[in-house]
From Swiss-Prot:
Catalytic class of the enzyme: transferase
Pathway: Cofactor biosynthesis; biotin biosynthesis; biotin from 7,8-diaminononanoate: step 2/2
Names of required cofactors: [4Fe-4S] cluster; [2Fe-2S] cluster
Name of the protein described by the UniProt record: Biotin synthase
Gene: bioB
Domain of life: Bacteria
Phylogenetic placement of the source organism: Bacteria, Pseudomonadati, Thermodesulfobacteriota, Syntrophia, Syntrophales
Organism: Syntrophus aciditrophicus (strain SB)
Length: 325
């Protein structure tokens, strides 16, 4: 099979010269391909994934450990107190409740488990509860324990690390140049600072964003290169699910092929990093969900999301086992 010449040249460059071979302008050229070349992009992204990531699949799971009443005004989020939604407001779950859910998801086949909380940050007592839960989960399951708790201080990051948290998740959400259109209650640099604090404490970094917010293709590349500069350890890719009551409620879903092209683009820019397909997968990709691996993905969230329902974990495991893996 003869691939599109641009796709083939850039893919070979990545295979020959290493994970950071692609320049910003070369990445942008992949967003300007004719429609007939998009399948070639997927095949090349799959080849890059297999070269750097083999066929290992990461199955992430998350728990909404504290829900609603967030002071931030992120345009897409149903948990923001600036939006009128039907999200249930709930304080932090007990450590026991978090441990129980982790054990259930471990039995179901998840490989990572993340405790996720609404709000800008947790207080010291809440951090202690999460740390206690993480310690028990680490000892009683096979799961890699993750946390997504908003902004961090050095002391809170150190407590999480001591408790057994391995990965800290904190999305940039979008490009720096587009961020003011999405959130005005905190600065982009605060998110980057949290990632740096987490890394200094010895936590691995999981950071990505949401696509379909109105950002341009160049801004998608911009965020990818910011993540590359930060050298994050894994990258979650979300697609906007326009929820009633949010400022994004009337936005259209990304077309499935465009969503898959985003995945392939990020595989070219991040050849050796796990790309995890997360929120909006089912509603955006529909019958094309199994194509995520062809497009370069190496993992996904299984089970439910924060405020929306996912599909049965068994269905996703069957999809993987009967597909490319």
């Amino acid at each position: 099979m003869i691939l599109d010449s641009t796709v083939n040249m850039l893919a070979q460059k990545i295979l020959d010269e290493g994970p950071q071979a692609l320049s910003f302008q070369e990445a942008c050229s992949l967003t300007e391909l004719p429609a007939r070349s998009i399948p070639d992009l997927f095949l090349a992204a799959c080849k890059i994934r297999q070269h750097y990531q083999k066929d290992d699949v990461v199955l992430c799971s998350i728990l909404n450990a504290k829900s609603g009443a967030c002071a931030e005004n992120c345009a897409f989020c149903s948990q923001s107190g600036h939006h009128r939604t039907d999200v249930v407001k709930r304080p932090l779950l007990s450590a026991e409740a978090m441990i129980e859910e982790a054990r259930r998801l471990d039995s179901a086949g998840a490989t990572r488990f993340s405790m996720v909380t609404s709000g800008s940050r947790l207080n010291a007592a809440e951090i202690e509860t999460v740390g206690q839960a993480a310690s028990a989960i680490t000892k009683s399951t096979r799961l890699t324990v993750c946390a997504s708790l908003g902004q961090l201080t050095a002391s809170s990051a150190e407590r999480l690390k001591a408790g057994g948290v391995s990965v800290y998740h904190h999305n940039l959400e979008t490009a720096r140049s587009f961020f003011p259109q999405i959130c005005t209650t905190h600065d982009y640099e605060e998110d980057i600072e949290t990632l740096l604090i987490a890394r200094k404490a010895g936590l691995r970094l999981c950071s990505g964003g949401i696509f379909g917010l109105g950002e341009s293709w160049e801004q998608r590349v911009e965020m990818a290169f910011t993540l590359r500069e930060l050298d994050v350890d894994s990258i979650p890719i979300n697609f906007l699910n326009p929820l009633p009551g949010t400022r994004m409620a009337d936005r259209s879903l990304l077309p499935p092929m465009e969503a898959l092209q985003v995945i392939a683009l990020y595989r070219f820019i991040h050849p050796a990093k796990p790309l995890l397909i997360c929120g909006g997968r089912e509603i955006t990709l529909r019958d094309f969900q199994s194509w995520i691996f062809l497009a370069g993905a190496s993992g996904m969230i299984v089970g439910n999301y924060l405020t929306t329902q996912g599909r049965d974990i068994g269905m996703d495991r069957d999809m993987i086992q009967s597909g490319l893996f």
